[in-house]
Amino acid sequence: MREIVHIQAGQCGNQIGAKFWEVISDEHGIDQSGTYHGDSDLQLERIDVFYNEATGGRYVPRAVLMDLEPGTMDSVRAGPFGQLFRPDNFVFGQTGAGNNWAKGHYTEGAELIDSVLDVVRKEAEGCDCLQGFQITHSLGGGTGSGMGTLLISKIREEYPDRIMETFSVFPSPKVSDTVVEPYNATLSVHQLVENADEVQVIDNEALYDICFRTLKLTTPTYGDLNHLVSAAMSGVTCSLRFPGQLNSDLRKLAVNLIPFPRLHFFMIGFAPLTSRGSQQHRALSVAELTQQMFDAKNMMCASDPRRGRYLTACAMFRGRMSTKEVDEQMSMVQNKNSSYFVEWIPHNTKSSVCDIPPKGLKMAVTFVGNSTAIQDMFKRVSEQFTAMFRRKAFLHWYTGEGMDEMEFTEAESNMNDLVSEYQQYQEATIDDDADDMVNDY
């Protein structure tokens, strides 16, 4: 029931995805060969959300792995959980997209896309009642951004009524991995605005900050960053996988979080953030969790929620706790900080409570917020985009793959529209429309 097909695209997507499967397998008591070694029936009760039971009681992830070069796939296959995946579900090319969105979306990616869709179709057909798709990818490179968005639009055509959720790694403000990031990201956002249902915005810099500041790691690796992301990813779907007092799923999340169809870019956070060794020593209360979860330092993307207002927010608690306390804490946060929530959506937080906490913790919470502050992120990318596009720098790499400059201009204006929409709703108050209505008569 309620299965989710997981897709990972490009190097970043595959590395986050691999970590995610480690976390999920751990929660469900599945070892590296796919055999169940858990200690509770609850782990098996709804394991079919992410796993398919194969012959001999092996559990196989409903995962599709794709990339335009074999390197990352090989390291996933050689990694700790590499033997878990279905060998046919690794789809890769040999050429690589070379950080070029056009290669991923129009040339190299377009050649590979049909074989990816075949695998996706096969996974979807193996589901009783498909809830939707979740995709991990980055927007700065070529494959995850170009081919990832191509796949999203193809899946959209074929499964229009299924939820499409993406975990998208945006380019960071100060650290850049690729010079052409602003181009790739802007072209991708152009696609995500139209074709995705919910986009969880992640950003390496914010993750590094969490590792330095909160976890006190001196030299965080990508493994540490991806561990943070997968903790939050596991929290988003925990209500589907474990029994709880108050459930949420991808569709409920979408309905509660998206007031206007284009504004579906969310900040995610996770609490408690404790370094790996020190988890066991103190139990947190619901109050502390709530406080930590709304803290700007907890957000996995580099926009400060205090610079905008929350249109909506959703908190997914995990562990044994009283729902009454959860409700009280959530409404207390809203009353205390009412200026940070738009007043024209009363009660704009949703909470859910799932009984099973993540491994090693007594209680935890995943936070998903739809805040107007996310416009900072788009503004930043857009400024970098404009600076390069004005000089037509690096454009020949894209036009050489058959792209048109028009497409860049469209993507740019779509992103700027998005920013001004967020700005408009940030400033809107209840009284705005009242005046307009008087004028209508």
Curated annotation (Swiss-Prot):
Its main location: cytoplasm. Mg(2+) binds at E69. It comes from the Eukaryota. It is found in: Cytoplasm, Cytoskeleton. InterPro entries: Beta-tubulin_BS, Beta_tubulin, Tub_FtsZ_C, Tubulin, Tubulin/FtsZ-like_C, Tubulin/FtsZ_2-layer-sand-dom, Tubulin/FtsZ_GTPase_sf, Tubulin_C. The keyword Chaperone does not apply. PROSITE patterns: TUBULIN (PS00227), TUBULIN_B_AUTOREG (PS00228). Its cofactor is Mg(2+). GTP binds at Q11, E69, S138, G142, T143, G144, N204, N226. One of its GO terms (molecular function) is GTPase activity. Transmembrane segments: none annotated. One of its GO terms (cellular component) is cytoplasm. The keyword Cell membrane does not apply. Dimer of alpha and beta chains. A typical microtubule is a hollow water-filled tube with an outer diameter of 25 nm and an inner diameter of 15 nM. Alpha-beta heterodimers associate head-to-tail to form protofilaments running lengthwise along the microtubule wall with the beta-tubulin subunit facing the microtubule plus end conferring a structural polarity. Microtubules usually have 13 protofilaments but different protofilament numbers can be found in some organisms and specialized cells. Tubulin is the major constituent of microtubules, a cylinder consisting of laterally associated linear protofilaments composed of alpha- and beta-tubulin heterodimers. Microtubules grow by the addition of GTP-tubulin dimers to the microtubule end, where a stabilizing cap forms. Below the cap, tubulin dimers are in GDP-bound state, owing to GTPase activity of alpha-tubulin. Belongs to the tubulin family. This is Tubulin beta chain. It comes from Babesia bovis. The lineage of its organism: Eukaryota, Sar, Alveolata, Apicomplexa, Aconoidasida.
